[in-house]
Amino acid sequence: MWLSPALLLLSFPGCLSIQGPALVRGPEQGSVTVQCRYSSRWQTNKKWWCRGASWSTCRVLIRSTGSEKETKSGRLSIRDNQKNHSFQVTMEMLRQNDTDTYWCGIEKFGTDRGTRVKVNVYSVGKDTMSTSNQLPWPTVDGSTDMVSSDLQKRTYYMLLVFVKVPALLILVGAVLWLKRSTQKVPEEQWRHTLCSDLDSELLAKDISP
């Protein structure tokens, strides 16, 4: 069964449901704000921010209340703008060990929706906090729903099978068809010329005494 690329993307959790920046950068001791947008259907759902390279094992650091009220936890804050269908996560007093993979997520029945965001903290001077005094992000009690961590890989492979491979086959077929067409034209012209020559010879024999 053929699926268009748009329908194919919609068939995977998280695709087009929530979107965010692939990478954000902030200075050490400074702050960074990440804005993630979501579909209107998730307007009143709780939003969260978790840390970890793998979706299935990341730790939720902060979660909204399902309203537009700002929630704070240590150096983190989250605010949901339901009218604009977006929410913002602010990380303050950035540290070098805050550099990691994070996820913008939507809490829902069944499988949560999420998108990956890379956070990169760069140094701006020598007067920085020592790593011995750095504290980990607070972890919100409760577990997140477990989903496949290979979501993006599966999306790529499905696009490859349903879009790129058929397109390549169509292209090869078109080239072969054009090649056969160009080969037939000289053959038909040769037959036409041969028949014309034979007709001319027969006509000449009939006219001659």
From Swiss-Prot:
Signal peptide span: 1-17
Record-stated family: Belongs to the CD300 family.
Protein name: CMRF35-like molecule 7
Cysteine pairings via disulfide bonds: 36-104
Record-listed Phosphoserine modification sites: 196
Site feature (Interaction with TYROBP) residues: 164
Gene3D superfamilies assigned to the protein according to its UniProt record, in alphabetical order: Immunoglobulins
Extracellular side, ranges: 18-157
One GO-annotated biological process of the protein: cellular response to lipopolysaccharide
The entry's keywords: Cell membrane, Disulfide bond, Glycoprotein, Immunity, Immunoglobulin domain, Membrane, Phosphoprotein, Receptor, Signal, Transmembrane, Transmembrane helix
Segments on the Cytoplasmic face: 179-209
PTM per Swiss-Prot/TrEMBL: N-glycosylated.
Native species: Mus musculus
Coiled coil spans: none
